[in-house]
């Protein structure tokens, strides 16, 4: 018996999965000229957007339930292997600079850890216990949320994490790119992004990866909107951590509060880099500590804080 025959998870036939089936449009992929090749990819890459649109109800449900838990101090974890895991890490890493969120609030957990970001560690995804262990190492608990990402829906690492989440009462959300009857996953919310067979058979870094990234973008951004980190379409909790973001903060102060650039620099410094505090201070005359107290009273919701004082921003 070979080492492959001895492991049922490794030797299982996955040919029935939508993501593993050959795409009839690309049977002569290697014979196409470059222009035809590019055109075919462009045409197929319209499918991820429709797949995400078709899953909008389950994505909306996920956003509301995640936001509710995060308001109560819970955290959001993305768990995956290979491309799926890397996309989770990418989305989580963007939350602190965009929304000034605590790095602990949204975390990406990748099979194989940081080294797997640069060098593929695909074999680690076959270890179901590893999914549970990696979550345990981060103190994952009943108040937290897990989005288990597995394009083909069969990854033991992700299945193990989702099973663990459900067993302790955490929110378990599955995200896969095959129908649920092809690969059922233990979860409270089931997000299925049906992008169809890949042009390069089985290469789920393509359409499946694109749809996954789109869905994660929506989830994290919509959750942060619900948490009050956005006013209108401005990221009013942006972290002023580099010159580009300082410039963005100053433009937000100008556009929302009518605050000129030089005054904005002074206010931003007094507010410790917080756009929200700077806007409240400029509009109300409150000191930084008083503005912070007002904001905390309204759970960080800038619009509510302004309304409580009878104030309005330039763009309300």
From Swiss-Prot:
The keyword Lyase applies. It is an enzyme of class 4 (lyase). Keywords: Carbohydrate metabolism, Lyase. Its EC number is 4.2.1.126. It holds the Pfam family GKRP_SIS_N. A lyase-type mechanism (elimination/hydration) is suggested for the cleavage of the lactyl ether bond of MurNAc 6-phosphate, with the formation of an alpha,beta-unsaturated aldehyde intermediate with (E)-stereochemistry, followed by the syn addition of water to give product. The lineage of its organism: Bacteria, Bacillati, Cyanobacteriota, Cyanophyceae, Synechococcales. It catalyses: N-acetyl-D-muramate 6-phosphate + H2O = N-acetyl-D-glucosamine 6-phosphate + (R)-lactate. Residues 66-229 form the SIS domain. PROSITE patterns: GCKR (PS01272), SIS (PS51464). One of its GO terms (molecular function) is carbohydrate derivative binding. SUPFAM superfamilies: SIS domain. One of its GO terms (biological process) is N-acetylmuramic acid catabolic process. This is N-acetylmuramic acid 6-phosphate etherase. Residues 1-24 are annotated as: Disordered. Transmembrane segments: none annotated. Specifically catalyzes the cleavage of the D-lactyl ether substituent of MurNAc 6-phosphate, producing GlcNAc 6-phosphate and D-lactate. NCBIfam families: N-acetylmuramic acid 6-phosphate etherase, PRK05441.1, PRK12570.1. HAMAP family: MurQ. The keyword Lyase applies. Belongs to the GCKR-like family. MurNAc-6-P etherase subfamily. It comes from the Bacteria.
């Amino acid at each position: 018996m070979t080492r492959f025959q001895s492991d049922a998870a490794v030797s299982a036939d996955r040919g029935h999965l939508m993501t593993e089936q050959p795409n009839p449009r690309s049977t002569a992929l290697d014979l196409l000229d470059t222009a035809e090749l590019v055109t075919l990819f462009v045409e197929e890459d319209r499918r991820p957007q429709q797949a995400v649109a078709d899953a909008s109800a389950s994505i909306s449900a996920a956003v509301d339930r995640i936001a509710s838990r995060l308001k109560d101090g819970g955290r959001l974890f993305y768990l995956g292997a290979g491309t799926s895991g890397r996309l989770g890490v990418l989305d989580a890493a963007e939350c602190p600079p965009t929304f000034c969120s605590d790095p602990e609030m949204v975390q990406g957990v990748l099979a194989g850890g940081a080294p797997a970001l640069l060098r593929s560690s695909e074999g680690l995804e076959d270890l179901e216990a590893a999914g549970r262990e990696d979550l345990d190492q981060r103190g994952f608990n009943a108040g937290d949320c897990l989005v288990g990402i597995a394009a083909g829906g069969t990854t033991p690492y992700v299945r193990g994490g989702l099973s663990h989440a459900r067993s302790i009462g955490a929110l378990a959300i599955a995200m896969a790119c095959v129908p649920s009857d092809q690969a059922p996953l233990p979860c409270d919310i089931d997000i299925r992004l049906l992008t169809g067979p890949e042009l390069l058979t089985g290469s789920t870094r393509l359409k499946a990866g694109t749809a996954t990234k789109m869905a994660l973008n929506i989830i994290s951004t919509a959750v942060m909107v619900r948490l009050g980190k956005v006013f209108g379409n401005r990221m009013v909790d942006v972290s002023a951590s580099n010159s580009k973001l300082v410039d963005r903060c100053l433009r937000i102060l100008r556009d929302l509060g009518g605050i000129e650039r030089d005054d904005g620099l002074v206010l931003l410094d007094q507010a410790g880099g917080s756009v929200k505090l700077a806007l409240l201070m400029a509009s109300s005359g409150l000191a930084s500590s008083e503005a912070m107290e007002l904001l905390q009273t309204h759970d960080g919701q800038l619009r509510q804080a302004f309304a409580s004082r009878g104030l309005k921003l330039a763009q309300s």
